């Protein structure tokens, strides 16, 4: 398959994986390996990547030489907090510019605050960040974020951590059809079929965390998600047959059969 290209860099995997909620760093690494993910997102406010020298460092098991780390602003509720967090991430990662922006608007649902998200995106793009941005499934907001200069649009499929799957495929389809940057479904994926559906719609990738980390067997689920993303992408590229009513046809030709009778309803 053709690679996923984000901010000028190519990736063979279209599955992006988060690092939260695992039992320990060893399980995190095992899940990453099983998923085949190359872009790994890290919550800067919750995960140590050098801020706390006396604590285990995620970079020891997921070194930047092997993976593209995607610092994110999970837990930020203002544009100012989000910008400050990503500036810190850039310092900790020696000038790393590819980041995931999310500014939340509600602590219970974790819906994005799109006004604050747009505000933060403008600042970050101006400062040279390559911004992958978590947003609602509103096509107008998605276009505004692309116009600002975001490197990828990441609409939610449903609430973060809900596992409810894709609730509004029509809006996602509009975003995909109109976007000229990668569209990556972020939030709400619960199982492999959700990931496959997102890819069949034409999404360029899928980002997930809870669906893998909270599975009964996270490593096995990571492997399942890898296959689902690949299968969904191949199905999208292959092009599904059209849906039809009253035009059913057998998969094997009926002409030339030695025996058989015509169903009486065929002449009615």
Swiss-Prot record:
Superkingdom of the source? Answer: Bacteria
According to the UniProt record, one GO cellular component term is:
cytoplasm
Compositional bias per record (Polar residues), positions renumbered to this chain: 259-268
Per its UniProt record, what Gene3D superfamilies does this chain match?
Answer: Aldolase class I (3.20.20.70)
Q: Which SUPFAM superfamilies match?
A: ThiG-like
Assembly and binders: Homotetramer. Forms heterodimers with either ThiH or ThiS.
Q: Where in the cell is it found?
A: Cytoplasm
Give EC number(s), comma-separated. 2.8.1.10
Residue sites binding 1-deoxy-D-xylulose 5-phosphate per the record = 161, 187-188, 209-210
Q: Which InterPro entries match?
A: Aldolase_TIM, Thiazole_synthase_ThiG, ThiG
Name the Pfam families on file.
ThiG
Q: Cite the GO molecular-function annotations of the record.
A: thiazole synthase activity
Organism annotation: Nitrosomonas europaea (strain ATCC 19718 / CIP 103999 / KCTC 2705 / NBRC 14298)
Protein name, please? Thiazole synthase
Region ranges (Disordered): 248-268
Task: Name its pathway.
Answer: Cofactor biosynthesis; thiamine diphosphate biosynthesis
From the UniProt record, list the reaction(s) this protein catalyses: [ThiS sulfur-carrier protein]-C-terminal-Gly-aminoethanethioate + 2-iminoacetate + 1-deoxy-D-xylulose 5-phosphate = [ThiS sulfur-carrier protein]-C-terminal Gly-Gly + 2-[(2R,5Z)-2-carboxy-4-methylthiazol-5(2H)-ylidene]ethyl phosphate + 2 H2O + H(+)
- Give a GO biological-process term: thiamine diphosphate biosynthetic process
Coiled coil start-end: none
Active site residues per record: 100 (schiff-base intermediate with dxp)
Please describe what this protein does: Catalyzes the rearrangement of 1-deoxy-D-xylulose 5-phosphate (DXP) to produce the thiazole phosphate moiety of thiamine. Sulfur is provided by the thiocarboxylate moiety of the carrier protein ThiS. In vitro, sulfur can be provided by H(2)S.
UniProt family annotation:
Belongs to the ThiG family.
Q: Where primarily located?
A: cytoplasm
UniProtKB keywords: Cytoplasm, Schiff base, Thiamine biosynthesis, Transferase
């Amino acid at each position: 398959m053709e690679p996923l290209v984000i901010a000028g860099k190519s990736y063979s995997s279209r599955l992006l994986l988060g690092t939260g909620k695992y039992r320990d760093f060893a399980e995190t690494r095992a899940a990453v390996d099983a998923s085949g993910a190359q872009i790994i997102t890290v919550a800067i406010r919750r995960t140590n990547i050098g801020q706390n020298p006396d604590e285990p460092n995620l970079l020891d098991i997921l070194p930047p030489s092997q993976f593209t780390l995607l610092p994110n602003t999970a837990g930020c509720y203002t544009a100012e907090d989000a910008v400050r967090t990503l500036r810190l991430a850039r310092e900790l990662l020696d000038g790393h510019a590819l980041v995931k922006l999310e500014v939340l608007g509600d602590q219970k649902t974790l819906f994005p605050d799109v006004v604050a998200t747009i505000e933060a995106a403008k600042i970050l793009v101006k400062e040279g960040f390559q911004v992958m941005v978590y947003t609602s499934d509103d096509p107008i907001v998605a276009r505004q974020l692309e116009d600002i200069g975001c490197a990828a649009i990441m609409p939610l499929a449903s609430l973060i951590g809900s596992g409810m799957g894709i609730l509004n495929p029509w809006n996602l389809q509009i975003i995909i059809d109109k976007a000229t940057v990668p569209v990556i479904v972020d939030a709400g994926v619960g199982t492999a079929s959700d990931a496959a559906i997102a890819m069949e719609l034409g999404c360029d990738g899928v980002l997930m965390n809870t669906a893998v980390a909270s599975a009964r067997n996270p490593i096995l689920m990571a492997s399942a998600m890898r296959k689902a993303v690949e299968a969904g992408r191949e199905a999208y590229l292959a092009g599904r047959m059209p849906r039809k009513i009253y035009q059913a046809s057998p998969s094997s030709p009926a002409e030339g059969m030695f025996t058989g009778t015509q169903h009486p309803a065929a002449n009615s």
